[in-house]
Amino acid sequence: MKKYLEVQENNTKDTVLCEMIRFQTDRGLDKKDFNIDDELLNIIEEMLEAKGVRDKDNREFSKIVLDSFNSFVSYVSMYEKDYYSEPTDHTEVDAFCDIVEYATGGILKKGYNPVIALDEMAKEINSRIGTFRNGKFTKDKSIEAQAKWYKANFTKARLQN
């Protein structure tokens, strides 16, 4: 399996990362001010989806989870000071890198090549057009737009045992 991953990574890893960055830059997302809660809201929405909870329209479920999370952090910062330090750029970037690392592990444990899976996801995301509303991308669901949608084929990423 290691050899298989090395071959695949050498062929596509730069392309996959570039496609993920392109999604952000084409839509001007990289120009928005950084807001940790907005970023965490996106991650929470995906975590809920992984558990079967759909929260696509108004993000209310994600907001409830984020509010609970923030209440916990506030409690720790006030009453458990030994376990809290003010976040820095370094700790935030480190945390996001760790999230990517754990997500990569999850994809591998499910039996998929993360590079190919991410490539498929990038193709799907970049095939969509739409608008942003409240910080969330809303797909154009017109017949013309749907005709251009690519559906990720994760079977291409399935690892051979």
What are these regions (language model features)?
Residues 1-96, 100-161:
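Flexible "arm" and connector segments at domain edges
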